[in-house]
Amino acid sequence: MKILIITQYFPPEVAAGANRAYEHAKRWVNLGSEVTVVTCFPNYPTGTIPEKYKGLKFFEEEIDGIRVIRTFTYATPNKGFFRRILAYFSFMFSSVIQSYNKIGKQDVIIASSPPYTIGISGMVLGKLKKIPFVFEVRDLWPESIIQLGQVKNKLIISILEHIELMMYRNAKLIIGISDPFVDFISSKGIDKEKIKIIKNGVNIELFNLKELDIQLKESLCLNDKFVVSYFGTFGLAQGIESIVRTAKILSNEPKIHFLLIGDGADRDKVLALKDELKLDNVSILKPIPKEELVSYYSISDLMLMPLRNLALFNSALPSKMFEIMAMKKPIVHTVDGEARKLLENEGVGRYVEAENPEKLAEAILTITKDSKWLSSAAENGRNLVMNKFNRDFLASEYLEILKRL
């Protein structure tokens, strides 16, 4: 089967969408499919294009058997709504032009959103090439940007919702990432039979158990510390400043240390808040390649999974959650809804009200004294991902759905 994936994010970027596209594509190649990925030059979230690609408008390469076509985008840091919109639309146009000229014959087009402008690329190409268009919805745009307060103009919202509905209607198939997506999308008048769910998962081979990296722990001066970690995006949706304020509350607990690794629109704010509060119990590091991140998981005792207190996140099953469980680390999270139900039912995580540093501090302090829960939560999480959220199984299931189109 010949599969075209259009995605704004792809390795070496480390965004959730980049990982999902790559992990599925690699497995589909191993299962005998020919996979072409049309993406932009890597620049997320810093807006900086690596030296290898600088000055290029087009580049083709092969990554693990995947044909990767990189095309122009307006590279900008993940800051400022209108600059990001320009980045989205520039790639939307360039992806259609390059795909039309370069992809050859394909059996199916998967447009992986967000940003939801990718859906327009897939819809247009599907019509031009007369190829089935599959709309993969990883985030409910424009609902998410409306609830985050990034768009308030009623006319613009109406236009965005009209385009959203047009993409749903024109897609041969819609792929969501959690069960509530079915109800949300079908509430727009879309047949439920057209919507399938392929949840996020984890690469068990990459995120495999690792012995405590004593040398790394020593280099970070974390010996004898209970390390509370967050690895991921420092963005508007995550509310990382709440973690820093939690660290302030626990600053009189010398055994507890916070380790934050990542980048994003709010990174400078987080760094400034740490300095303002004069905290020495918080370490903030720049993004680290996934292959190396495993060592940082090994020195962590508890992982945080924050999202802001917004209704749109009730349907979320963050991909980071599955990496954490694969590494046998217990989770404290602020994600109500689907994630809370899964983690609590499986005895893996504890829920704390979002954007409430006092409650988060209280939960962390309680957990540090509960070695029995820490051990059982770690074991339960590993067993869960091994049995239900292995990328190998999920990719095979996805491919079988595509073959039935």
State the predicted function of each range.
Residues 180, 201:
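Carbohydrate-associated surface elements
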Residues 225, 359, 366, 373-387:
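A short, well-ordered alpha-helix in the C-terminal region of glycosyltransferases
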Residues 259-262, 267-295:
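Nucleotide-activated donor-binding/catalytic signature segment of Leloir-type glycosyltransferases, i.e.
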Residues 222-238, 243-247, 259:
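Conserved donor-binding/catalytic core segment of Leloir-type glycosyltransferases
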Residues 186, 192-194, 202-218, 239:
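Acidic anion/phosphate-binding donor-loop and adjacent secondary structure
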Residues 302-305, 323-334:
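Short hydrophobic beta-strand element within catalytic cores of glycosyltransferases
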Residues 51-59, 208-221:
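A short helix/loop element that forms part of the nucleotide-sugar donor recognition site in Leloir-type
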Residues 345, 350-357, 366-372:
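Conserved acidic donor-binding segment of nucleotide-sugar-dependent glycosyltransferases
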